[in-house]
């Protein structure tokens, strides 16, 4: 809850990023980047409202975040997701992510851990 109440604490530049996509004045999607160390970052909070899915918004957000991570000097991006989000896992794998061992303390059983070389 702290993370959502104060997102700038975790996702503010220079080490993080937070993007919000709006259609008109309506927020429809978001994505964030969090530094793990000098060379590795984590993709966080990818979300697109259901009524806006299938329009390439998630893919555009992922591309933007990966480009920003490269510019910031990160060489590797990791993320965790859930097995009940197969569309997200397919998107990540299409963008070059591959499965890795657990890298964090995510308490959700069955989480899927992915990595991409930037």
Question: Can you say where each PLM-predicted feature lies in the sequence?
Answer:
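C-terminal "cap" of GNAT-fold acetyltransferases
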Residues: 75-78, 82-95, 99-118
